[in-house]
Amino acid sequence: EIRSHRRSKSLRYQYRWGNYWYCMNTIKKNGLRINSTLFDFINKEAIPETNVDPEVFWLKFEEALSELSPLNKKLLDERENIQKKIDAWHIERSDKTINKKEYIKFLKDINYIVEEKDDFVIETSNVDSEISSIAGPQLVVPVDNARYALNAANARWGSFYDALYGTDIIPGKKDHRYDPIRGKKVISYVRNFLENVAPIKNGSWKKISKIIIKENNLIFFIDNNKYYLEDKRQFIGYNGEKEKPSSILIKNNNLHIDIIINEKSVIGKDDDANISDVIIESAVSTIVDNEDSVAAVDAEDKVKCYRNWLGLMKADLKTEVIKDGKKFIRKLNLDRGYIGLDGLKFELRGRALLLNRNVGHLM
């Protein structure tokens, strides 16, 4: 049962589910009936700073709906019709063995399978490197959870030490307090990793006592002797001073490794080369999901999703997090700055490339 009450330019709809009445305020605009929560979000939060007139937006939105909705319905009707034919075909033969040739012919007859076309070439331009040239992990995160979304966006860079220490890759029990023995196992694991991805010619990451930069090369000291990377091109940047860098940046397979040097840190002061952490580039892209991992049904649900996405796009999304009894604000990471071998400063992207996934034509 539905009841409606007119209030100026808005309609207040009430619908009953069981013994409960639910209210839905709507705005009438250009032939559309728009939920007031969504209407206010678009006008007051999404459109400002875009140089788009709200009146023009709603007018063009209505035009797009009027043009595309019939086409969308036609596609869905066609899909439903094909599905009914396939269902009927299988039901009729439920007690028979499927003849493959007969089945393929049937699928072609109903245009489920179409004839293969001539070979062709297609190219796209201006594709982000995270899609076109970098091979790396991709995450999927529900857009309605701000904390999860921020974590995923920030997952492009992370401490290799922390990741290993907190997982069962390193055997043994984990405690809330720092375990130096477990810490040494982590450091050994990372040194082996560096031996593989950025080997030192005739040397070892496990034996270095100092790292400096000279003539655009990394110099590793082992027993007062100098050693270099096997592939000197892997070293592309640093922070700090050449004689005392605070970090060195290495590139491998289009991904980056940031080796942090800090003699005053808990880890670095006990390390022969004062390496305190190794930050690796990992999840280069993230699917921000409006679909499988999210249940966004009504306007309030959807606006929550849209608001989080807007915050990600404007880079101002943040949320309060409580961890180990401590409160802090989680927000998007900044880009990472370095000094290049030419002496000029440059930046690497600090966040994952965000992709928005939705299936509006089905929802």
Annotate each PLM feature.
Residues E1, Y22-M24:
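Initiator methionine at the very start of the polypeptide chain
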Residues Y13-Y15:
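Hydrophobic alpha-helical signal/anchor motif
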Residues M24-R93, T97, K101-V114:
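N-terminal-proximal low-complexity accessory segments that begin disordered
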Residues K105, N111-M363:
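Catalytic alpha/beta active-site cores
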